Amino acid sequence: MALEGLRKKYKTRQELVKALTPKRRSIHLNSNGHSNGTPCSNADVLAHIKHFLSLAANSLEQHQQPISIVFQNKKKKGDTSSPDIHTTLDFPLNGPHLCTHQFKLKRCAILLNLLKVVMEKLPLGKNTTVRDIFYSNVELFQRQANVVQWLDVIRFNFKLSPRKSLNIIPAQKGLVYSPFPIDIYDNILTCENEPKMQKQTIFPGKPCLIPFFQDDAVIKLGTTSMCNIVIVEKEAVFTKLVNNYHKLSTNTMLITGKGFPDFLTRLFLKKLEQYCSKLISDCSIFTDADPYGISIALNYTHSNERNAYICTMANYKGIRITQVLAQNNEVHNKSIQLLSLNQRDYSLAKNLIASLTANSWDIATSPLKNVIIECQREIFFQKKAEMNEIDARIFEYK
């Protein structure tokens, strides 16, 4: 129809613009065959992603028809009454939105890129880390958090577990050193969606990254003797203990989360507690004598996130500010520098005390009594200290 004819048919500018705007094709990310809540298999995920990308390519390349990508978002925790939340991404943009909604184009590009990555990686049956995907296109993703966010969107729409799918895993962070072998038996799904038992071994006598494994894995220790577990905050302290391992008690396993532990380090400890507790005589956490060290220790034992990974056998043993003061008073020991608490440290210590005493004002009977007292002492002395030069005797077990 000629423009003159359109102008006669549509009297207003708004009607004319609407008539000239091409109709969009809606493409849904979630699989209709699994709307009942059952998770998709790897084969189903691959088939649906290929179909999804094929529809998008045909619309854009062959029909010059813009598309609208529709997907579900997670509801807030505890929200069961509100309807499902759907988000729509339009591509390409036109009209006044072309300049003002550039961020939507980036979202669409990230989602399509990740779907392509999943389609390429999933048939290989090998794990890929979020970090590797991020560095494959830093300009597009900008932050690793964006990769994690959109992978969660893909997993949620296919009803997949956050940790058990797509063969894309977080980069390993935690380190372990063991004087005996540790075997991890893991059930994995092949590309044909068939279960397969996989055995991974942490070899003795050298530090290594905690390997990735699923939530239902089983861990077995290659020893029949009782052992101890020492968890330290920093990699530097971990390395120092490994280099001076002869000073520690025999059969001591060393672990570090390199700061705040990732889920894999916490899951590893939880599995040790679940399957090997009869062989573990003691499990101790050592961090810096500062509020952040205490917060890191609580991440292992009393974290509000993912309670399934809490390790109840782990005990906070310090270092405590009083231990540092005692070591500085001894003649033959190297003095440890005491640092002043800054405002941020003070606020964190105060908030920790408030949260730990929220349900009980009776500190004397609290299971976290030692942690609360340590926070109070650090506030009282207005001092903190790092554990790098602490006397190695505190790690010994008699």
From Swiss-Prot:
Compartments reported by the entry: Nucleus; Chromosome
GO biological process, one term: sporulation resulting in formation of a cellular spore
CDD domains found in the cross-reference section: TOPRIM_TopoIIB_SPO
Positions annotated to bind Mg(2+): 233, 288
Keyword Transmembrane helix: no
CC annotations in GO: condensed nuclear chromosome; nuclear chromosome; nucleoplasm; site of double-strand break
Cofactor (UniProt): Mg(2+)
Keyword Magnesium: yes
Location of the Topo IIA-type catalytic domain: 40-175
EC number: 5.6.2.2
Alphabetized GO MF terms: ATP binding; chromatin binding; DNA binding; DNA end binding; DNA topoisomerase type II (double strand cut, ATP-hydrolyzing) activity; metal ion binding
Function: Required for meiotic recombination. Mediates DNA cleavage that forms the double-strand breaks (DSB) that initiate meiotic recombination. The action of SPO11 is important in setting off a regulatory chain of events encompassing 5' to 3' resection. When there are no SPO11-DSBs, resection of a site specific VDE-DSB takes place but it is faster than in wild-type meiosis and increases the risk of uncovering flanking homology.
PANTHER family for the chain: MEIOTIC RECOMBINATION PROTEIN SPO11
Family that this chain belongs to: Belongs to the TOP6A family.
Protein name per the record: Meiosis-specific protein SPO11
Gene this chain is encoded by: SPO11
